Amino acid sequence: MVMGAFTGVLFNLTFEKSLGSATPWLSLVAAGLVGVVFSLIHAVATITFRADHVVSGTVLNLLAPALAIFLVKAIYNKGQTDNIQRSFGKFNFPVLSDIPVLGDIFFKHTSLVGYLAIAFSFLAWFVMFKTKFGLRLRSVGEHPQAADTLGINVYLMRYCGVMISGLLGGIGGAIYAQSISVNFAVTTIVGPGFIALAAMIFGKWSPIGAMLASLFFGASQSLAVIGNQLPLLSSVPTVYLQIAPYVLTIVVLAAFFGKAVAPKADGINYIKSK
């Protein structure tokens, strides 16, 4: 997400004059590709060289912000980029925006990427549970030995899984940076990735479940923005509203971690000879 956010903002600032309103959308492609390249580091370390997944992930979490800020200072000679002038904008849904009450809340002056993300979760569910590729991908995370016996290339499928996660993480970071912070700095991506992990666990490793959990965490994050405008929360200090998403993350993990069953081979290196 960090590298995707940096790439998305950099692409936006570089090509906004030549690409116009398509700039933020095309920046998602660039951010996704950078996410894939960065995820390959993790894939090579854990799949090919069988490094510990936690150690490799920790190294990348330390490397990404440091590399991004180094590049920001090298390009802009300061600690953050300039603010972008072109974002995804707001969208009104025809017909739906005319519905009393609900139309004003959900379908008028809203973010289109949010609805695209919801639609994508259903597409991801279909691919994972209803297609041959998805079943193979799940099998190498559940029981790689059995998958190998059936002729499935475990290493290739695991590489595909990591690269897809890098693609989506890069796109997610670019959307976050261009929708909320409108620039990139060291504090642009602080915590959303870990909240995404919590959403995955809360959603029991299902795309639709993770989407619903993300909506829950997103609603808690929005309290920091609009909480003071709500009568029930107007007297609550802003700092408490800002930490609410992370407190809820800890509570959810403590309550549901034992109930959410992860794939049996999650985080376990596969050795073909065993």
Please identify what each model-predicted range represents:
Residues M1-T7, I47-L60, R136, I180-F194, ...:
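Short, non-helical or kinked segments that cap or interrupt transmembrane helices
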Residues V2, W25-L33, V55-T58, Y115-A119, ...:
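Hydrophobic alpha-helical transmembrane segments
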Residues A5-F11, P65-I69, G114-V127, V162-G172, ...:
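Hydrophobic core segments of alpha-helical transmembrane domains in multi-pass membrane transport
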Residues S18-P65, Q221:
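Alpha-helical transmembrane segments within multi-pass membrane transporters and channels
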Residues A64-F129, P231-L241, G267-K274:
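Transmembrane helix-bundle core of multi-pass membrane transporters
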Residues F106-F184, P207-I208, L212:
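Helix-loop-helix "hairpin" substructures at the membrane interface of multi-pass membrane proteins
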Residues E142-T149, N153-L156, G227-K274:
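Cytosolic-side transmembrane-helix boundaries in multi-pass membrane proteins
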